[in-house]
UniProtKB/Swiss-Prot annotation:
Signal peptide: none annotated. One of its GO terms (biological process) is DNA repair. Can catalyze the hydrolysis of ATP in the presence of single-stranded DNA, the ATP-dependent uptake of single-stranded DNA by duplex DNA, and the ATP-dependent hybridization of homologous single-stranded DNAs. It interacts with LexA causing its activation and leading to its autocatalytic cleavage. GO terms for cellular component: cytosol. Pfam families: RecA, RecA_C. It comes from Rickettsia typhi (strain ATCC VR-144 / Wilmington). This is Protein RecA. Belongs to the RecA family. It is found in: Cytoplasm.
């Protein structure tokens, strides 16, 4: 078959597929609109840089997992706030029945516009998510959490009944159904997950996430979030030092990490990240305990500089802009971004 005949045959096949399944069902990759991946900021400057595209990708499945009280829900509430700032409509499937509206509001979430559902079963939660995603009107949906998506058979059964892998089967079936709708509607779908210990593991990490392996495969981005220390004001604990690692990334190189502070009552401290990244990139000068920007001293001690940046948002925004512009250089400054 000559090249001309091949081209005619392909054109005829493409026309037939479009006639059967609608315009846009098949095309050449270069003709596809929005080849560049759009992203929504995570609310953390360091994590945006670690993700490689300035945030979480639209139209993809994201998994955020970690131990208890590590900041999983805080991070997702920041995601919602950032999406709403960009005019997005968000939904929160609260399977754990534990969302605190007052805390969400403090983190910048417009709770009057946030759609919330507190389903009784895992099937109900995933059906609600599927309906909202297929509507095309939702920009971001959070499912909190995979561990709380209890199958109906387990709820209706006796307390001691063995329900072998029923949750894993439920997740596998749901993700097969959801994945095409998520991509088509450009909806960011975030699953929060918990950690469990595997019994009898001699080598390697004994940790695993709940709900089987399906989510590990379908997720484009997997973020591991851990609390690594406390932030104290004299004797009072006022926040936690947090480390996140992008353990899977289909849109950029994986295994990059970021550190940030989560302050109780106000969430991720952007000012703290601006200071740390600014010093690493030599945008902010540090001499002993003093910090300076453009040869002008801006404070003594990290907490005082954080307060200065809060009171002078124009300077904070200016430094943040320079950090984002230099973000390509950050990969060379080793934020522990390669797997050890």
């Amino acid at each position: 078959m000559s090249n001309t005949d091949k081209e005619r045959a392909i054109a005829a096949a493409l026309a037939q597929i479009e006639k059967s399944y609608g315009k846009g069902s098949v095309m050449k990759l270069g003709q596809r609109p929005n080849i560049d991946i759009e992203a929504i900021s995570t609310g953390s400057l360091g994590l945006d840089i670690a993700l490689g595209i300035g945030g979480v990708p639209k139209g993809r499945i994201i998994e955020i997992f970690g131990p208890e009280s590590s900041g999983k829900t805080t991070l997702t509430l920041h995601l919602i706030a950032e999406s709403q700032k960009n005019g997005g409509t968000c939904a929160f499937i609260d399977a754990e029945h534990a969302l605190d509206p007052a805390y969400a509001k403090k983190l910048g979430v417009n709770i009057d516009e946030l759609i919330i559902s507190q389903p009784d079963t895992g099937e109900q939660a995933l059906e609600i998510a599927d309906t909202l995603i297929r509507s095309g009107g939702i920009d971001m949906i959070i499912i909190d959490s995979v561990a709380a998506l209890v199958p109906k058979s387990e709820i209706e059964g006796e307390m001691g009944d063995a329900q072998m892998a029923s949750q894993a089967r439920l997740m596998s079936q749901a993700l097969r159904k959801l994945t095409a709708s998520i991509n088509r509607t450009n909806c960011i779908t975030v699953f929060i997950n918990q950690i469990r210990m595997k019994i009898g593991v001699m080598f390697g990490s004994p940790e695993t996430t709940t709900g089987g392996n399906a989510l590990k495969f379908y997720a484009s981005v997997r973020i591991d979030i851990r609390r690594i220390g406390s932030i104290k004001d004299k004797e009072e604990v006022i926040g936690s030092q947090t480390k996140v690692k992008v353990v899977k990334n289909k849109v950029s190189p994986p295994f990059k990490t970021a550190d940030f502070d989560i302050m109780y009552g106000s969430g991720i401290s952007k000012e703290g990240e601006i200071i740390d990244l600014g010093v690493k990139l030599e945008i902010i000068e540090k001499s002993g305990s003093w910090f300076a920007y453009n040869k002008v001293r801006i404070g003594q001690g990290r907490e005082n500089v954080k307060q200065y940046l809060k009171e002078h948002p124009q300077i904070a925004n200016e430094i943040e802009k320079i950090i984002r512009e230099k973000s390509s250089a950050i990969t060379n400054i080793n934020l522990d971004q390669t797997e050890e």
